[in-house]
Amino acid sequence: MRGVRGKRISMIMQDPKYSLNPVVCVGKQIAEAWLTHHPGRKDEAKARALEMLEVVRIRQPERVYQLYPHEISGGQGQRIMIAMMLITDPELIIADEPTSALDVSVRLQVLGLLDDLVQSRGLGLIFISHDINLVRSFCDRVLVMYAGRVVESIAAKDLDHARHPYTQGLINSLPDMQHRRPILPVLQRQASWLTD
């Protein structure tokens, strides 16, 4: 299992504040991911960790390597989480709401970084989000889940033509600045969605 988890598939968690160990400097945490799959190669682990900090566009990687999680910003923390996941050269990254704790400008930087890494390294990316507009602009294909089941698979560019009532309800509940509505529609859930 360890040969797949972390090595071939890595996961970027939602909020680095809760994912990083508060009593270990961030560089050592990145290096630890490398050492899990390459035991006994500590010097190489530190060099790889510094390289990954550069890959995720962290300025002054040697300085940041020594910092603790409380000493870094939210955007830096998310980049550090990405570096930790990239250090093992995975084939697939699962990103669970990786930008939900970030402000809009930092969110765009992190999304740009993820997109560049996917393109340059040929990675697969599963991007988990509740933000329909973000998914529409960032993803190629969308799997819509309801109660733990996939209810619709659709190209992101075709979301406006979704067929499943749950997907339609999610889209219709989004505020629209062009067409003001006094009340946003409420999604009417149906038991048949669990059996279809």
Q: How would you describe each model-predicted region?
A:
Residues 59, 63, 154-196:
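Short catalytic/signature loops enriched in Gly
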Residues 108-121, 133:
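Helical segment within the ABC ATPase nucleotide-binding domain
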Residues 135-137:
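A short, surface-exposed alpha-helical micro-motif characterized by mixed small hydrophobic
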Residues 30, 82, 93, 106, ...:
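Hydrophobic anchor residue at the start of the ABC signature
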Residues 1-10, 36, 158-162:
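ABC ATPase NBD coupling module
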Residues 87-91:
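A short, proline-enriched helix->beta-strand linker immediately N-terminal to the Walker B motif
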